[in-house]
């Protein structure tokens, strides 16, 4: 029904690590979810809905057979499809997913990811390798958690 991709992590530079200890995470790799559950475009609406419900996911990355990102399916996509047509349950993901989503790379600065999410009014960005294969996902929740860490560090330093 779905596949788990192992995280393809690469060590951060020593400088980046020191900076992140002082001011918090600085790159998408510092805050992304690295083990991504993916679906293929041919999976069914029900496959996605059941997976997302069982795992408490709000988003799933849709990939082709080379693990290249071709879409994202969200809980909103599922609700929208049902609202438009109660018979949507028989559709495949390629009919209801958001195709060709905006992506980022693991070394993308967090501020750039935040800017993309805000500008496009989206809630997640698949993280891809140079070859376009998925290696993670960063969500608005991940970014808020990182912001919270920075605020907590600033607050501690102010005491």
Whereabouts are the PLM-identified features?
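Tandem CBS (Cystathionine beta-synthase) repeat/Bateman regulatory domains
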Residues: 1-159
């Amino acid at each position: 029904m779905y596949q788990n991709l192992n995280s393809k992590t690469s060590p951060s530079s020593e400088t980046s690590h020191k900076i992140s200890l002082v001011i918090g995470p600085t790159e998408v790799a510092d805050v992304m979810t690295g083990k991504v559950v993916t679906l293929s475009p041919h999976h069914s609406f029900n496959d996605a809905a059941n997976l997302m419900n069982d795992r408490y996911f709000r988003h799933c990355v849709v990939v082709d057979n080379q693990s290249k990102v071709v879409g994202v399916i969200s809980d909103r996509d599922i609700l929208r499809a049902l609202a438009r047509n109660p018979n949507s349950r028989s559709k495949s993901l390629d009919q209801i997913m958001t195709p060709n989503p905006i992506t980022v790379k693991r070394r993308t600065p967090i501020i750039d990811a935040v800017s993309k999410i805000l500008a496009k009014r989206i809630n997640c960005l698949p993280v891809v390798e140079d070859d376009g294969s998925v290696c993670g996902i960063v969500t608005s929740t991940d970014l808020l958690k990182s912001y919270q860490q920075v605020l907590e560090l600033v607050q501690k330093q102010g005491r």
